Swiss-Prot record:
Pfam family, one: EF_TS
This protein's name: Elongation factor Ts
Function, as annotated: Associates with the EF-Tu.GDP complex and induces the exchange of GDP to GTP. It remains bound to the aminoacyl-tRNA.EF-Tu.GTP complex up to the GTP hydrolysis stage on the ribosome.
Region annotated Involved in Mg(2+) ion dislocation from EF-Tu, chain positions: 80-83
Similarity field: Belongs to the EF-Ts family.
CDD domains given in the database record: UBA_EF-Ts
Lineage, opening ranks: Bacteria, Pseudomonadati, Pseudomonadota, Betaproteobacteria, Burkholderiales
PROSITE patterns registered for this protein in UniProt: EF_TS_2 (PS01127)
Amino acid sequence: MAAITASMVAELRAKTDAPMMECKKALTEAEGDLVKAEELLRVKLGTKAGKAASRVTAEGVIAAFINGNQGAMIEVNSETDFVSKNDSFIAMANAAAKLVAEQNPADVAALSALAYEQDGFGPTLEDVRKGLIGKIGENMSFRRFKRFDGTSLASYLHGSRIGVVVEFDGDATAAKDVAMHVAAMKPVSVTSADVPAELIEKERTVAAAKAAESGKPAEIVAKMVEGSVQKYLKEVSLADQVFVKAADGKQTVAQMLKAANTNVKGFTLYVVGEGIEKKVDDFAAEVAAQVAAAKAGA
């Protein structure tokens, strides 16, 4: 068997962008034949990535990049929380956020095509993603991102699972506090006037159904419904919420911002896996199915 040299490993890595250890294993299996090793490696990593690509990615991280008045936030998903803590996965997410801020891709496909190299993979971000899928054995995906430009920005990340970017004029410390508040209280808009009509209508429908059960006169029911809607609007609008750091427990975000001479133009809130239906494994059913299949084949 031919000796596996460092130069052979380096040559195979240059051709395939695969990790060095994978290159060495492939060369060993191919008994030093570079052509055969390259084929083995591409099949191995390609198959591994292909199997993972169909699996649900509901875990992951939120990454943000801010540079002056330019920035971006992105959600990058993985299958498990374990992989979301992987250094290579986190590095890819942070790099993706920076790429969004600096190069302004139109969508995920455009982002994926941008030049980027990491961990021996490249020359595009998509190649790095596929390489890490093959290396780690889990599906990964760039789910969504938003780019910010032309205004002051403040960001807050809570354990990498919740991310907030606030667009503002005024005091940076106050804006940072607002970002933290948004992460904790999850408002849906800056003011009650900005709450989406469909959310208001949904709340009105629920309130009407509850009020109707009271058996009170129609005019009283109407007032009850309106009262419930107004209460809801105060609960979900940033300006009307009680500031999480209020010393007296009463100061609203609007009052805090006025005192700080600061204006919040908007905010973006990302929560990892929000809206993604996670697969719940029923291990008892899986075992039962395997037993039944074994009996049928006997």
